[in-house]
Amino acid sequence: MTNIHYHKILILDFGSQYTQLIARRVREIGVYCELWAWDVTEQQIREFAPTGIILSGSPESTTEENSPRAPEYVFNAGVPVLGICYGMQTMAMQLGGLTETSDHREFGYASVSLENSTALFANLNDNLTASEPKLDVWMSHGDKVTRLPENFKVTGTTLTCPIAAMSDESRRFYGVQFHPEVTHTKKGLELLTNFVVNICGCETKWTAENIIEDAVARIKEQVGDDEVILGLSGGVDSSVVALLLHRAIGKNLHCVFVDNGLLRLHEGDQVMEMFGDKFGLNITRVDAESRFLGELAGVSDPEAKRKIIGKVFVDVFDDESKKLTNVKWLAQGTIYPDVIESAASKTGKAHVIKSHHNVGGLPDYMKLGLVEPLRELFKDEVRKIGLALGLPAEMINRHPFPGPGLGVRVLGEVKKEYCDLLRRADAIFIEELRNSGWYEKTSQAFSVFLPVKSVGVMGDGRKYDWVISLRAVETIDFMTAHWAHLPYDLLGKVSNRIINEVNGISRVVYDISGKPPATIEWE
């Protein structure tokens, strides 16, 4: 079997907003990598045995006392090192160079003139000006290297940054003041490929097929002939976990699908058809709608609703698990960003991830071992594996759906009547987005039930019914978002269909709030 972890890159995180993007680019090249806090020990690096090391950017300044530094062993490990932005600056300082606060900060696009040959820039240039090769890059820095360490040479300059790139070819140390990991740097992926593949010598074994083979083998080794239980929601993560486990252990996997009455139109039937009929999984559907809605009765506070939904899920899942006396393992859809955010740095700067609604409160007495086949993978990698396992693209690329489901898209108290109206309205909205080609152009689109009534006219009579708000946004990272400028004709068609086809809705409005100041979801 292919050893997909033999060649690997260690990325030391100094706190840049782009650090996870570096890791995703390295994985995209086809090489395994891990992202660790900058304050790792020499022993940890030795045990990981990286083929190469990348130092990330940072919001910190190398000119400040007590700013983070790379472990000294990084430069004595005998492997190539690439410093990006702050990573280049700390490399320069730690090896005897000098950095200073720049008089001219660079934020945004810049053109780097390439000087002196370097393996990092081999066969790279965006344009030639008077026979001088240039790279179009993305800068984001306030400090700059003003004196090179011994044996380094300048390999790139800009008008305001004389040392925009540097290298020591003999030790295979490289620094770039710009960010090759962002798409704004046009040849960024090629630059990282030069480092990871050509300089570090990594083989590109990190592929969907190899990852599946490795995951299945590791599951078999971990659980043997034991039985495993999984809460299958129909979302991408739990679906991919289910198919990996099914491939590894077959009928020893017990999937529990909790139908909480807060799902999209026909979603419960679709999950059963997909995983029970098509893939032949051992799956139990629990109709818990009345239980969830009963607990939610009279509750309007969004956070209280989330907690109730999470608690009831745990109770229902626990009831089902008690029926399975031989289960020894609990499978979860933990992915790599969860692992990164949960990791505690000894500096205390690491973030603690929010608890997931469906795994955060499992009873201690269940005492099951954890199986987490996706814990090394980013979300985009999970999607690629899902496609390779046979999940339909329409499901893999579906817009995000909140864990509490319609519980946070029905504003205020959640009632069955409201959920039923919202399900039908939302299905019409999504159908028309798909028909018009706008579903793929938006990052997330959904309907919201507003618990207010509005006067309308239907035929010769007046009616006094509920209001639906449509929401569609465009975003790259979901940290910020713009409202989608859907065509008026499309919005008009959706509105007419909802009002005419969903009895109980009298008015449809469109949410034109960005994030910030608004959040994407209403609750």
From Swiss-Prot:
Active site per database record: C85, H179, E181
Residue spans crossing the bilayer: none
Pfam families the UniProt entry points to: GATase, GMP_synt_C, NAD_synthase
Record's catalysed reaction(s): XMP + L-glutamine + ATP + H2O = GMP + L-glutamate + AMP + diphosphate + 2 H(+)
Annotated ATP binding sites: S233, G234, G235, V236, D237, S238, S239
Gene Ontology cellular-component terms listed: cytosol
Domain Glutamine amidotransferase type-1: 8-205
InterPro entries: Class_I_gatase-like (IPR029062), GATASE (IPR017926), GMP_synth_C (IPR001674), GMP_synth_GATase (IPR004739), GMP_synthase (IPR022955), GMPS_ATP_PPase_dom (IPR025777), NAD/GMP_synthase (IPR022310), Rossmann-like_a/b/a_fold (IPR014729)
Domain GMPS ATP-PPase: 206-398
EC top class named in words: ligase
GO biological process entries: GMP biosynthetic process
Entry's EC annotation: 6.3.5.2
Keyword tags: ATP-binding, Glutamine amidotransferase, GMP biosynthesis, Ligase, Nucleotide-binding, Purine biosynthesis
Pathway: Purine metabolism; GMP biosynthesis; GMP from XMP (L-Gln route): step 1/1
Listed SUPFAM superfamilies: Adenine nucleotide alpha hydrolases-like, Class I glutamine amidotransferase-like, GMP synthetase C-terminal dimerisation domain
NCBIfam families for this protein: guaA_Cterm, guaA_Nterm, PRK00074.1
Known partners and oligomeric status: Homodimer.
Function: Catalyzes the synthesis of GMP from XMP.
Protein name: GMP synthase [glutamine-hydrolyzing]
Gene coding for it: guaA
